[in-house]
């Protein structure tokens, strides 16, 4: 699945693919009940090869964000708060506006997040074998960052 929008792409449903899912827009917004998924098999499980890439000036993905291989988000501001996000590798690259995984559940084999702004994981849960966070400011009030490897 390859989606391009010149303005806002508003996902209030499900965008699912057997392979890769790539989304480019000025703004990407996904509601709490939405799904972005890549690498789904016939039963709806992430077992097939597939990567999910979201690229926009502002990404707000508060639903389920799933990929078998890599989930990559590139944006000035990344808001994954309240989401359920899982992939083999998760790569979050944000600008000055920062990254939020507040009250989210994020699971990966390898999690990499880079921002010159704040990384907010208040009430969130990050679990990965390998975690690399590059930021000058981490807020983790009542959050959990669990590196298992």
What residues fall within each predicted segment?
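Extracellular beta-strand scaffolds
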Residues: 1-3, 7-11, 15-23, 27-36, ...
């Amino acid at each position: 699945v390859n989606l391009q929008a010149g303005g806002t792409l508003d996902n209030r449903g499900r965008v699912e693919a057997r392979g890769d899912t790539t989304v480019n827009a000025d703004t990407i917004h996904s509601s709490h009940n939405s799904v972005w998924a890549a690498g789904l098999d016939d039963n709806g499980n992430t077992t097939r090869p597939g990567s999910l890439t979201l690229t926009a000036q502002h990404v707000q993905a508060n639903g389920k964000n799933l990929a078998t291989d890599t989930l990559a988000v590139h944006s000035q501001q990344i808001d994954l708060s309240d989401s359920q996000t899982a992939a083999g590798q998760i790569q979050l690259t944000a600008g000055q506006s920062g990254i939020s995984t507040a009250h989210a559940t994020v699971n990966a084999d390898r999690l990499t997040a880079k921002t010159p702004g704040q990384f907010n994981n208040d009430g969130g849960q990050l679990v990965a074998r390998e975690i690399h966070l590059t930021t000058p400011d981490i807020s983790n009030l009542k959050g959990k960052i669990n590196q298992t490897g």
